[in-house]
Amino acid sequence: MENILDPSVVNSHILENGSRRSSINPILDSELRDKTFEKAHRRSLTLLSSFTSSMLELPNNGKEENHRRPSVARSSSDRSKASAKEDLFSEAFRMAEQPPAEALTISTPVDPINIDELDRAYAVSPSDTSNLLHPPTSSSSIPIPIKNAGHSNLDHPIRPSLQSSISSNRIIKSPGIKEDDYMHRGRSISSPMIDVEHINSTAVPSKTKNLPEKPKRSHKLRNSITFAKIEDHPERKSQLRRLSSSLKCFDPEYDYNDPSLSIRRDSSTYYFSNVNETYDEEDSDLDSETSTVNWVQSVLNLPSLLSDDLMANPKNKERFEWQYMLTSVLTGDIVRSEKLRLRKIASSREGRNSDYSDNLWMEIWCWLTHRSVDSYRENLKHLRTGMVDVLLAIMNFHWDESNELTPIVAVDNMLQKLDKYERLYPSRRSILQEHSLYASESFQHKLDVLTAYSNVTHALEIQVNIIRSWVGNEEMDITKNTTNSINNVSQISNGPFVERFYRETGLIRAFEQRIMTNMNSVLSKVCNTIVTYADDLKSYGLPLIADDYMRLLSFPFRLIKEFLNLRLSCAENITSISLFTIDSLLDDLRNTMKVAVHIIQQHTVLIKPFRDDSKFVDENQSLNNILVASLKFYFNLLHRKVRNGCALLHFKETEILEGEWDFLLAVCPHIEHGFQIMSKSLSSLVGEILTNINRYLKDQLQGPDTDDSALITSFYIKVLDCVRIRFRKLMSFTRILKAHLENSCEYVIKENSLSLLIQRLEESNHVLTYTASIEHEGAYVIVPGHLVDSPNILREVLSMTFNKGDNNFESVPPYAVVLAPDSSICWNGHVTDLDIPEVSISIAPNCVRLVTLATANQLSVIEDYFISIVGDTVSLVDSAKANSSKINKQMTKIKRNSLKLALSLLDVIQTIRTRYHGMNCQNLIHYSFSYAIEFAQRLMRLSILDASSIGLIRRKMIQLAISWVGFIYEDCSPTDRNTFRWTVTALEFAMIMTYGSNILMIDKKSFEELKEKVGKCVALLLLHFDVMGTKHAGRSMDQQAGDIPARLVRNNSDRSRLSDNELASFVKEEVMHRIIELESNRRDRLYKSQLIGRVLDDTTKENRLLKELASSKSNITIRWQQGGLIGSGSFGTVYRAVNLDTGDLMAVKEVALHKPRISRPMIKRIKGEMLVLELFDHPNVVSYYGIEVHREKVNIFMELCQGSSLFEFLRYGRIEDELVIQVYVLQLLEGLAYIHSCGVSHQDVKPENILFDHNGIMKFTDFGSAKMSGSASTKIFEQLTQQEEEEFEKDSEFLQHLDQNRGYSLTGTPTYMAPELILGNPSERVGAMDIWSLGCVIVEMATGSPPWPRLDNHFSLMYHIAAHNPPIIPADDQLSPLGQNFLKRCFVSDPNQRATAAELLMDPWVYPLRAGTEFDLMNSSVVESAPSTNGAPLEL
């Protein structure tokens, strides 16, 4: 039992065991210790006011108000915050130490105040607490809130500061405060009904009694104190009264002894600042006066807003005189001397504050321990005698191997001893005064080191324990296999930690919350401590806690490495990969590599104290190798996506690359050879896309098999627009890529100029550099002299394959000259060595390459500088190229493919003109000419091609101009008005292409042909010229009106735009992508508190229900990864998932089992859907794979339909082609006929539950509301094992529940619900309600809106259906008569007379499709076929 007489024990309660380790930052540790100790000391000073307020009471008959300044008062909300946690002594000590009964009086709660706001002159001495009845603050007891110092999860309290503690009644510094201000502040929180002199004279140690009320004397005392100093100086008083009278500030008729006057002065006249800044003696008048003068001067410098006439008005003279008088009073000698005198008085009181606080602390403990001050002081002297030994022990502390205690235990014991003795002192100032060793800098430094060591060691232990608990084993082995089972029947969760972690897809959330935030925060502080105190710890014999530190530091590396290894191994097992699988893998790799790079960035800094640790270097290298493999696999997937993408990706190929740009720029710098892989792969992708565009153009040029000129024109316009859009986007991206990859230019050495070139390089202070790698290719590296001392920059210049463009050079960028002479050279300049990685540059003999850090857009600057040095000894060959031979090869391939595509497009016009000559396709041919000219001009402006390629395109354009002029004369009708407009355009283009020296590029034969055709076109123009205006005047208004639609039609045909379906698809994809992201984030938050793999206790009802599902034969264990959200409903949420064993995509329906929801009906519903799905095996019903049971959820694995749902399809409008509706209805009937033949009724047929797979096949899903007939129950029993039969016998009502109860329950969606379900009279015929629902779905497909669109609520809808009102049959323009008769058979009110699915398959509306009349058309819609070489292009 603790000794209450021991002040160290009592003080430990007062300090509330504040931990020394509340902060483990070694730099800020001393400051935090000072602040925490100061808070604890100030709470102990507040204790007296709390006790006296609870014991004492001042009678108040309601005659006087509680006059307290607003700054002290607290609101009711603040009072409510003074809870039991804050009120440390209000209840505990009242129960332990009850004051005498005669000392207690009735008290009323008022606003609590802080004792720091009390003036010492009016505070009652703590030694007289047994003799007082009334508190010195107000007429009611005032509870003082004791603010907690706060607890930490560490054990040692923070040491107090070296500053001397500030008294509880410190003076608040405020501008312009005077002595009477200070005195008045003390009175503002004291009652005017207290007679201080009477209290002091009547205080008797042995007993207490109530004091009589003497308000008049109290008022006199108050005001006598206020004006005492002025009464001592009659001259000053008279001067102040005369001045105040003139200023109307003091009225001679006022009674200055009136208490109301002081109240008003307290609330309005005086300003009390809340700034917690103590007044120092060094603060002089000069500071405040200087600041005041500066402020006044700044106000006077403001421009006046009044006019000069108003300022000079004699009527305003009185105001200026008054203001001048006010200024004279406040800036005169009287006020200045009074301010100085009051400051000196306040400064003299400051020295007495420390003694007062020490006495207050002493008297508090005397009161608590029921001892006198003298005896308690003697006891303290005896207890403090061991302080010197503890200080010496700390100064001499050194741990060695012979010590029986571990380093951390030895340090903790030493700090605990010091804490015990520190509690024996009221403040650190007292310790400093008594022990000079404690105040020494060496002692404080060693104490800081030991405290920091204790903090970081315990923090590391806590973090290691957290990670061990998370992983599940003491070794923190993430690959260790752990298995938990339920009664050895079925396994709920198994596998290593990395697989369980991978399965839940909480990678980003886990790393951000558990590793990146918490663990990295601890590691960074440990790193700072080790770096700061490494030498000190070594001198004290304390180890550097490297084991736990390195164990934590390597954990993220091992986890992310295993995660990537697992992902890559699973990807290798994928046999058939689809576009959806590629997107899922790309997204997974992208997120994982981001996390891995983030780990590398943060831990590069944290490894500094152990940079030579070989284990960490090996782990870093192994992680980098995995990242390299992941990056290569990432680009492999991009290649597959671009190569095997659907037609929708034709317009988005470049957007795919642009979307990956920012990610690659963030990841590749931190992967070894990352930029090299990125540059090579991106350039290869661009070249592959160019090849695809060229192949697409070649295939589509064969044209459609039709003679209709309108269809032919529309076909080719769409083809050319598609090529133009794809090529334009790709060239824009290629220009960006070219600027980052091409960082050099190449020159050829002129004949007999090699020696002169060498001489000029020597004279310009260039240095020959031996690299031991480039010399093998017959080349030499020459660098500027100022870069010799910067080898890292030179290595970056020579080995750089990708320039990020983030370098800002004030002058010439760093560069290197690679010289490949064709003969031997003699270098007379400086020579140095440079070790660089092996780089393949492939430079031709007799050439010079200028390599720089500048981008391709900045090469011109370095080229001019280089030419200024070498002069005319070289000539430019290639203005921009990549220094790496592999990347330059890819860029050359891109340029060659771009030129090939451009020439193919220019040749397309002649092909189209020849093929469709005489077929009235003049509009198409003219559009082709305009298209080719625009395309060629854009290509030359992109600066992708070199000079030779541009010259070749220019020659092609000249030939195109000649052919265009020939087309106008030979193929166009002279009387057509379009011919005149086309002729002007063709002649203008011919004029531009033959301008200047271009006319000399035409051979003689072509020039003669051009002259002839131009002459004929000019003659053609003369037929359309209307010089006198007679032709125009003769035109009628009807002809003009008739021409307007023609112009509109032509403009519309020339317009290139995307179709509505294509735009809608783009918008839909973007919206779905955003929705999936939001749902994925929501799912991660919901998985935060999961409990996986625990053993079930079958004694509880909930666990018994889970055991029923876990014991099912369909309970499977597979390795899978959860993907994005597909949809959610009231029964569960569906996600996309990947089978890690096979690589197949699947859908996972997650049913949450929160405890309020775990009931027998819920389990029966899950089990019922599971049994129903096990019965089915049909192309038009989703396949069922099995279930996976967890404590908090059940996962149902089903087939993934990747083509959205019928509901999403109908959101964009009705299906206009009735043949498509017939194909869809035939598939739905096939599926319903099979479902009904199994004895199951779906009971929830609606567009949301009809899905499309990737081939367009429709499938039924969501059998949560299905009803099973007797035949289905029999079939289920035939498939049961003996163990399952025993379980069903125990639960005999289960199948009855499936068979009967659901049939009579109101299940489904009201819009598609049959009348018998609403009326509660279901038919014995299986699936009759499904036929009604199918008819409603057909109505929605034909009309675009659900049945009864005008009924706005479910109640009116159900009432309408219950009245046997069928939906409105679509009109004749929406559905044929056969289709209308089909719907009438579906909407028969009597379910027994309603047609079945098998009967409807024989209906004339769908039977021809089933029999094969239209089967070819249906087959082509659902089977993927090779791209047609003669059909129309896919219209999106």
Curated annotation (Swiss-Prot):
Presence of keyword Phosphoprotein: yes
InterPro entries, sorted: Kinase-like_dom_sf (IPR011009), MAP_kinase_kinase_kinase (IPR050538), MAPKKK_Ssk2/Ssk22 (IPR017240), Prot_kinase_dom (IPR000719), Protein_kinase_ATP_BS (IPR017441), Ser/Thr_kinase_AS (IPR008271)
Binding sites annotated in the UniProt record for ATP: I1126, G1127, S1128, G1129, S1130, F1131, G1132, T1133, V1134, K1149
Stretches the record annotates as Interaction with tea4: 282-1123
Subunit structure: Interacts with tea4.
Function, as annotated: Involved in a signal transduction pathway that is activated by changes in the osmolarity of the extracellular environment. Activates the wis1 MAP kinase kinase by phosphorylation.
Name of protein: MAP kinase kinase kinase win1
Species classification: Eukaryota, Fungi, Dikarya, Ascomycota, Taphrinomycotina
